[in-house]
Amino acid sequence: MTQSQGQDPRLDTSRTIRAPHGTTLRAKSWLTEAPLRMLMNNLDPDVAEHPHALVVYGGIGRAARNWACFDKIVEVLERLEDDQTLLVQSGKPVGVFPTHKNAPRVLIANSNLVPHWANWEHFNELDKQGLMMYGQMTAGSWIYIGSQGIVQGTYETFVAVAKKHFAGEAKGRWVLTGGLGGMGGAQPLAATMAGFSMIAVECDESRIDYRLRTGYVDKKATTLEEALAIVKESDTPVSVGLLGNAADVFAELVERNITPDVVTDQTSAHDPLNGYLPQGWSMAYAAEMRQQDESTVVKAAKQSMAVQVKAMLELQSRGAATLDYGNNIRQMALEEGVENAFDFPGFVPAYIRPLFCEGIGPFRWAALSGDPEDIYKTDQKVKELIPDNPHLHNWLDMARERIQFQGLPARICWVGLKDRERLGQAFNEMVKNGELKAPIVIGRDHLDSGSVASPNRETEGMMDGSDAVSDWPLLNALLNTAGGATWVSLHHGGGVGMGFSQHSGMVICCDGTEDASARIARVLHNDPATGVMRHADAGYDIAKQCAAQQGLDLPMLNEELSKLK
C-alpha cells in the first residue's frame, strides 16, 4: 500500500480486516493459514481496540509495525512453504529461511531492547522513526482473543479474593476499579461471575459503550452518585461503567468516606504517554499534547497515577482488600514520590502463584473454521477429559452463557501441566476424525507460569529473590522452538511497560495430522513444565510435588524429587 508523504504509515481508516472462515485456504497449508488468520483476527474491529491504527489492546500494543509490513506479512504467509520459517522483527517481516517441517513457521521478536536502553524514552524515539513496535503480549504475537482472554484469570482472582477476605461470600459486596480497555474490559463480567458488583471508571465513553454492546458491562453512569445508586439498589451482582477519570473518582470516594470492599485498577498505567489520561485533561487535549510535548504528558499522567495510588492506599487502610492488577501503577506512583506505593500486593503473589506452581495458567484455543459449534464441541471434550473439576465445569458453562465471541470463536480455560497435552491431543483427534470443521490453534497469554519475568507482576516476591531473572522466558521460547510450536514469540515490556518485563509466547496448530500429534506431545508438555521447573527451582513445595508427580527431570532437584514420589 502506498502512503502519501507525511501520512502516518500505521493509520488507514479505509480498511477493515477480518480473518477468513471455512476450509478454503489462502496459504499453502494449515500451518501457515493459522498464523495468517490469527494475525487478521487480531485486527478484526470486533476484537481490536483501534484496528485502523493496527492497535490491538494495551495502549499501543500492535499486530504489525505499519500497514506496509502487515501487507508483506500476509503476502509471505500466503507463499510460505512447510520447510521455511518467517522471521518478524518488531512487527516487520525481515527474512524467510529454510528450516524443516517440524520447525516453527514464524518466529517473532517484539520490542526487545538492550537493558541499559530499555525505557519508554528510547523506545518512543525508535517507534517514531519506524524502527520498532510495541507488541504488548498477545497483540504482536497474534493470539489475542478479545476480552475473554483475561476473563477467567480475573474471575479466578476475584474468587480467591472472596475466599481470602470474605469467607467465600461475595454477595452484597462491590469492587472499585479503573480501565475498560482490552484487558480491563474483562473486569466487570469477571466480577459479576464471581458474585461481586463493580464500578469501573473509564475516561473514554466509546469503550464503555463497546463493553455494553458486547455484554461485558451491565450499566453506564455519568456520575459517581448514579453509579453508587445502581450498585446499592440492585439485588443481584451488577457492573457499572462510570465515565470519569480514575484518579478523580478514587480520590472522591476517600473524601466522601465511602469504602469499597475491593479496590484494584486496570488502566493502561504501564504506558504513561499513551495509556493514562491526566486529571483535568480532555481526551482531545491529551491527543494534541502527545504530538507537541511528550514529557509534559508523561509527567502529568504519573502525577495523576500518584493521586490514584494514594487513594488506593487510604482505602486499603480503611479496610478495602486492595490489589495491583499488573499494570505497574505502583511503580509509576513510587517514581512520583509515593514511597509506600508497594504496600498493597500484586495479584499474582497474593492469589495466583499456587496455580503457577502446577503449570496452571491461561490456556486458550480458537476455531479457525469460524464456527462457534467447534468451540462448543471442545468445551464438552474438556468436561469429558477433566470430569472431576466442578469449578472448571462451572466456568465453561458460564463462559458459554455469558461471553460473546469476538472474531474467530475462542475459549480460555485455566489448566496445567497434567492436562494441556491431553486436551491438545483430543482436539487434534477431533480435527482428524471430522468432528471439527477445521483445525484448532492452541496458545496462551504470556502471563503464564514459565514464560515471563516481571518483578512487579508475575514474578513479584519470588521466595528465592529471583524476581528479575529473565533467563526463564528465554529458555521457554527456545524450548518451544525446539519442540515445534507453529509460531513462537519473544517480547519485552508487555503488561508493565518498557524495562519491567520479558516474556514469551507460543501457538500450536492442531491440523489432525500425526506430525501435529508429535509436536503437541512435545510443546504442550514442555511449555507448562517450564513453569513448574521455574517455581520448583525457586523453592516452592507445590511445584516440587507437581514435578515429582509428573516425572520431570530437574538435575539439581532430582534427589529431592525422588523422595516425593
Curated annotation (Swiss-Prot):
<dbReference type="InterPro" id="IPR038364">
    <property type="entry name" value="Urocanase_central_sf"/>
</dbReference>
<feature type="binding site">
    <location>
        <begin position="58"/>
        <end position="59"/>
    </location>
    <ligand>
        <name>NAD(+)</name>
    </ligand>
</feature>
<feature type="active site">
    <location>
        <position position="413"/>
    </location>
</feature>
<comment type="pathway">
    <text>Amino-acid degradation; L-histidine degradation into L-glutamate; N-formimidoyl-L-glutamate from L-histidine: step 2/3.</text>
</comment>
<feature type="binding site">
    <location>
        <begin position="276"/>
        <end position="277"/>
    </location>
    <ligand>
        <name>NAD(+)</name>
    </ligand>
</feature>
<dbReference type="Pfam" id="PF01175">
    <property type="entry name" value="Urocanase"/>
</dbReference>
<feature type="binding site">
    <location>
        <position position="202"/>
    </location>
    <ligand>
        <name>NAD(+)</name>
    </ligand>
</feature>
<dbReference type="InterPro" id="IPR035400">
    <property type="entry name" value="Urocanase_N"/>
</dbReference>
<keyword id="KW-0963">Cytoplasm</keyword>
<dbReference type="InterPro" id="IPR023636">
    <property type="entry name" value="Urocanase_CS"/>
</dbReference>
<comment type="similarity">
    <text>Belongs to the urocanase family.</text>
</comment>
<feature type="binding site">
    <location>
        <position position="325"/>
    </location>
    <ligand>
        <name>NAD(+)</name>
    </ligand>
</feature>
<keyword id="KW-0369">Histidine metabolism</keyword>
<feature type="binding site">
    <location>
        <position position="136"/>
    </location>
    <ligand>
        <name>NAD(+)</name>
    </ligand>
</feature>
<dbReference type="InterPro" id="IPR023637">
    <property type="entry name" value="Urocanase-like"/>
</dbReference>
<protein>
    <recommendedName>
        <fullName>Urocanate hydratase</fullName>
        <ecNumber>4.2.1.49</ecNumber>
    </recommendedName>
</protein>
<comment type="function">
    <text>Catalyzes the conversion of urocanate to 4-imidazolone-5-propionate.</text>
</comment>
<keyword id="KW-0456">Lyase</keyword>
<feature type="binding site">
    <location>
        <begin position="266"/>
        <end position="270"/>
    </location>
    <ligand>
        <name>NAD(+)</name>
    </ligand>
</feature>
<dbReference type="Pfam" id="PF17392">
    <property type="entry name" value="Urocanase_C"/>
</dbReference>
<feature type="binding site">
    <location>
        <begin position="182"/>
        <end position="184"/>
    </location>
    <ligand>
        <name>NAD(+)</name>
    </ligand>
</feature>
<feature type="binding site">
    <location>
        <position position="495"/>
    </location>
    <ligand>
        <name>NAD(+)</name>
    </ligand>
</feature>
<feature type="binding site">
    <location>
        <position position="207"/>
    </location>
    <ligand>
        <name>NAD(+)</name>
    </ligand>
</feature>
<dbReference type="GO" id="GO:0019557">
    <property type="term" value="P:L-histidine catabolic process to glutamate and formate"/>
</dbReference>
<dbReference type="GO" id="GO:0016153">
    <property type="term" value="F:urocanate hydratase activity"/>
</dbReference>
<dbReference type="InterPro" id="IPR035401">
    <property type="entry name" value="Urocanase_C"/>
</dbReference>
<feature type="binding site">
    <location>
        <begin position="245"/>
        <end position="246"/>
    </location>
    <ligand>
        <name>NAD(+)</name>
    </ligand>
</feature>
<dbReference type="Pfam" id="PF17391">
    <property type="entry name" value="Urocanase_N"/>
</dbReference>
<dbReference type="InterPro" id="IPR055351">
    <property type="entry name" value="Urocanase"/>
</dbReference>
<dbReference type="GO" id="GO:0019556">
    <property type="term" value="P:L-histidine catabolic process to glutamate and formamide"/>
</dbReference>
<dbReference type="InterPro" id="IPR035085">
    <property type="entry name" value="Urocanase_Rossmann-like"/>
</dbReference>
<keyword id="KW-0520">NAD</keyword>
<dbReference type="InterPro" id="IPR036190">
    <property type="entry name" value="Urocanase_sf"/>
</dbReference>
<dbReference type="GO" id="GO:0005737">
    <property type="term" value="C:cytoplasm"/>
</dbReference>
